[in-house]
Amino acid sequence: PWKMHRQDLSPLLEDPKSKRIAPAMLVHTGKIYGSVTAQIPAADDPKLYHGPGVPWYVMLAEGRYKYVRNLIKDEMEELYDLDRDPEELTNLALDPLHAKRLVTFRKKAITELHRTKAPFAANMPRPSTLKE
């Protein structure tokens, strides 16, 4: 019933050292899908969380970096250097040296959400790290 978005990964399987053309995105909305996700539940609504308290989030990985945005108002964004920090212990989102990269990843994630027509793309809560 919902449109699926995909990329052909066969070039990566044929040559694991080849580079992905597009970033990888994961959208976690628990067990809620499609048009029902147009309205993001409030922070105190159990529908926002899945399993052991994991909220809705958007993750975008490209190259050595991974960006995570929890869909809770005033929640901090996350940015990790997966080469230097594969366990994702050091959040670079507040590091001034990575400010431009954070803005770039934020914009790429929003662009990809609009491209794939994610119903909640226009209603995302403002993160605490947004300084624009």
Spans of model-derived segments:
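Intrinsically disordered, low-complexity polar regions and short flexible loop motifs
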Residues: D85
